[in-house]
Amino acid sequence: MTPIQEQLIALGGVFQAAVLVDRIAKTGQVSEAALSCMLGSLLVVDPKDTLDVYGGDDLNLHEGYRAMASALERDPATLQREPLRYALSMLGLERQLAKRDDLLEIIGRRIPVIQSQVEHFGIAHENVIAATGALYEDTLSTLRQRIQVQGDMRNLQQPNNASKIRAILLAGIRSARLWRQVDGHRWQLVFSRRKLLKELYPLLHG
């Protein structure tokens, strides 16, 4: 796997999280497979490679790839505006989180607790989602920059949906951190668009 492919997979995780947040906000729906992939990515502590974080394949990242392609192509007809906004916000929040050792310590302490809940209840159980959402609220939500999610208030006001959104945002920020770890940089999204798209299309159609 090339370094750019590693970066695109991690960035695909960020955009996948963004797409799922947008879908829950607007429809109240999310597939269990997509949700499980995102939640599972938070629990992988020693991955062999980037794909390993998402369960060993990128089947559940394809919607993220599509949203990323629409952003890189800059075609107003296909651009997914809200997912793009969420993805860029997650990349920004990851930078703020990286400077906060106190918050990183809280996350590091509570992820194993969530892992034990997963072993007891299963990855997509409401207790796991609630615990993961609460972890986001206790850490990322305390930062100055906040992600404003737009959608149907009836969906956003349901506690289970709110927990899913926060849990997925935490997973998206985990993917943003992974992207940085494999040398992803925001300037690439501006200056290396064509190069990224050339490598992204085979992943998108694979």
Swiss-Prot record:
<keyword id="KW-1003">Cell membrane</keyword>
<protein>
    <recommendedName>
        <fullName>High frequency lysogenization protein HflD homolog</fullName>
    </recommendedName>
</protein>
<comment type="similarity">
    <text>Belongs to the HflD family.</text>
</comment>
<dbReference type="GO" id="GO:0005737">
    <property type="term" value="C:cytoplasm"/>
</dbReference>
<dbReference type="InterPro" id="IPR007451">
    <property type="entry name" value="HflD"/>
</dbReference>
<dbReference type="Pfam" id="PF04356">
    <property type="entry name" value="DUF489"/>
</dbReference>
<keyword id="KW-0997">Cell inner membrane</keyword>
<keyword id="KW-0472">Membrane</keyword>
<keyword id="KW-0963">Cytoplasm</keyword>
<dbReference type="GO" id="GO:0005886">
    <property type="term" value="C:plasma membrane"/>
</dbReference>
<dbReference type="InterPro" id="IPR035932">
    <property type="entry name" value="HflD-like_sf"/>
</dbReference>
